[in-house]
Design a protein with these regions (language model features):
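Short S/T/G/P-rich N-terminal loop/turn motif that feeds into the first structured element of a domain
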Residues: 1-39, 44-48, 82-84
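An amphipathic, aromatic/His-enriched active-site/gating alpha helix that lines ligand/cofactor pockets
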Residues: 55-84
Length: 84
């Protein structure tokens, strides 16, 4: 069963639309090879922090995808979704 996996990233300088598109393509390709699927991202208003949500077998699969893509990250962890 797939887990919810969260990735935290910090950008300095702030993330541009061009860079977002470039890294998104790299991560999609590498994540797909590990049965991980990007679901959504939350980018801070100043474009310096982003949290991405994946459905994946485990957090390690997503870490490996980011490392293979050469995209830095601050942290990757499995999470539980709580909503109203």
């Amino acid at each position: 069963m797939a887990e919810v996996v969260i990735v935290e990233q910090i950008f300095d300088p702030p993330l541009t639309d061009e860079e977002h598109g470039r890294i998104g393509k790299l991560i999609d390709r590498c994540a797909g090879m590990r049965n991980a699927t990007w679901m959504r991202s939350y980018l801070s208003a100043d474009r310096r922090r982003m949290f991405c949500e994946f459905e994946a077998p485990d957090a390690q699969s997503v870490r490996e995808a980011y490392r293979t893509a050469g995209v830095p990250f601050q942290g990757v962890w499995s999470a539980e979704l709580y909503k109203r």
